[in-house]
Amino acid sequence: MFISIRRLVALVAITQLVASFSAVPVLVASHRLAKGLKEELNGSGPQAPESATNLIKRLVTECSSDEYLVINQPGLVLEDMTVNEADNWPFLRRYIAMASSVVGIPWVRGALDLDFIEQYIISTCHAETMNVVHDDDQEVGNYIDTRTRVIKIDLSELPPRSDLELRYSVIREHDELIRKIIRKLPSPHYTIILTSDMPQNVHPIPNMVVESQPDKYQIFHDLVNDPSRELEIERNDRFHQTIEPYWSPDRNTINRYMENKKKDEIHFFDYDLWTRNEKLILTIIVMVLTLFTFQLTKLVKLLTETVFKKDKGLITHTKSE
């Protein structure tokens, strides 16, 4: 009994539907090096949300970043982040290229718990949160301290892929928004976590196909899987020199007044005082010695004359007798 073409097509469609799964892409990029992140993944295929979350926790545990950008882009799929779509993400790709650690996961079976990730960063790195919910960089206020920040960005949903022109336009706007927010950061040490909270149906793709067409089935394959990244090295050493902060002295305080008063006091045996006024002191010493010598000479002369007169008087008196 032969199966009709229509039934065969329907059977294939049902088989694919049953085999498909819901997934979201996840991109993690850290300006500072975090070794061994990929050890948390199970092979190169679709990953469980727990594996992706453990990868992020391993990165966060080091608290090597001053800012953590947790970006939720509803409707984002792998096809939006391939090499072919590079022109839509000029600024994000620039930050990826600068990062020391980058991991791209094309498919995670289910959305990540971004609220849990936010709280984990806050509790682990003693951070505080800034929220961006209206696609406006002005929602990120000015920094008044050096505390670690979690900048949670909830972007507007992407238009459907049936209207690619509009979808690409919105992606470019969001890429520009990310650039504006990063430029506001006072520190270059940041981490980017980009994903979606809206899983999309994905048909399984054989590993052989994925490996043969990485530009199509990997997140920004040319950057994330660049051969230079096989060796985990810190790419931003020049930013990481430890510099002691300059603390401005207290102004108009009792402590400063007392310190200045002590500095203004003159101490006779102060070595610095003698060193600073060496020429003046030598001049005074010479003048004193000169005056002393002059007075001593006068005294000696006076004594000599007095003794001479007495001797002369004694001699005259003896002769008269």
From Swiss-Prot:
Residues 24-279 are lumenal. Keywords: Cell wall biogenesis/degradation, Endoplasmic reticulum, Glycoprotein, Membrane, Signal, Transmembrane, Transmembrane helix. Coiled coil: none annotated. The chain crosses the membrane at residues 280-300. Glycans are attached at N42. It comes from the Eukaryota. GO terms for cellular component: endoplasmic reticulum membrane. Residues 1-23 form the signal peptide. It is found in: Endoplasmic reticulum membrane. The keyword Zinc does not apply. Its main location: endoplasmic reticulum. It is a single-pass type I membrane protein. GO terms for biological process: (1->6)-beta-D-glucan biosynthetic process; cell wall organization; fungal-type cell wall biogenesis. Residues 301-321 are cytoplasmic. PANTHER family: PROTEIN BIG1. Belongs to the BIG1 family. Required for normal beta-1,6-glucan synthesis. This is Protein BIG1. It comes from Debaryomyces hansenii (strain ATCC 36239 / CBS 767 / BCRC 21394 / JCM 1990 / NBRC 0083 / IGC 2968). The lineage of its organism: Eukaryota, Fungi, Dikarya, Ascomycota, Saccharomycotina.
